[in-house]
Amino acid sequence: MKAFTYERVNTPAEAALSAQRVPGAKFIAGGTNLLDLMKLEIETPTHLIDVNGLGLDKIEVTDAGGLRIGALVRNTDLVAHERVRRDYAVLSRALLAGASGQLRNQATTAGNLLQRTRCPYFYDTNQPCNKRLPGSGCAALEGFSRQHAVVGVSEACIATHPSDMAVAMRLLDAVVETITPEGKTRSITLADFYHPPGKTPHIETALLPGELIVAVTLPPPLGGKHIYRKVRDRASYTFALVSVAAIIQPDGSGRVALGGVAHKPWRIEAADAQLSQGAQAVYDALFASAHPTAENTFKLLLAKRTLASVLAEARAQA
């Protein structure tokens, strides 16, 4: 780990301004991903801005009847919240599938959204990686790619986004609230939050330099049957090969989003319109642009079977 300076700030505006003022600065709250990356010198911030004292740890009911989740709400507290368990069950189930209790105690809402890929070549500093070192190449393209993306990929990167929580929040049409160093606020839908890899996979989100997430807002509850199904190599504490988040209404309509298959939670609204036609039609809409490698082609069949299982469960419990 390289040397860095450290400060605590008192307001979100102060945090954003400090991040703009100090080149190479990073925000830190739970640190469950950032500290690991610093130890490996993948992340080398010159300055850490501790945002834990900003009071962004509340869950509030919005005027519309949804929820406003502070950026610093710990995953454990989000899982345990009565409204989340009752009205946004897919979110609580995704969080419980995502990490150990110790990690959930420390990890924050904003940090979960911003966690970096777990591609082994990203973590191996002896290998080329366009996310870690832009322009160096992508070792996964010709290397071990079993866990990598099958859709939304580019010639520069085939990494997946690892978050379970983000998949559920994308399903729920979450909106990210931010503050810029100029003191302006922005609202970014989660659909627009993650950038496709294209030729610049190191630019992962729509956040501007110094911009700080302050909250995530969920619309009013959708009702219906909430399901989160995660398929992985072992029963717990590992990342998804494929995950399916679904909300299915009694009439068979609904929505689905997938994890483990792309650079972001993968939701295609046109696929939702195919739910009445069955799993094959939904799969076809979701993966029309699929571009798997020889090693991860199995993910396509796995996704189709997992979708079919989730839809069958929803029908059985209707």
Swiss-Prot record:
One Pfam family here: FAD_binding_5
A cellular-component GO term for this protein: periplasmic space
Residues covered by the FAD-binding PCMH-type domain: 1-223
Statement: the UniProt record of this protein carries the keyword Oxidoreductase: yes
SMART domains: CO_deh_flav_C
Positions of FAD binding: K26, F27, I28, A29, G30, G31, T32, N33, L34, T108, D164, I213, K230
Protein name per the record: Aldehyde oxidoreductase FAD-binding subunit PaoB
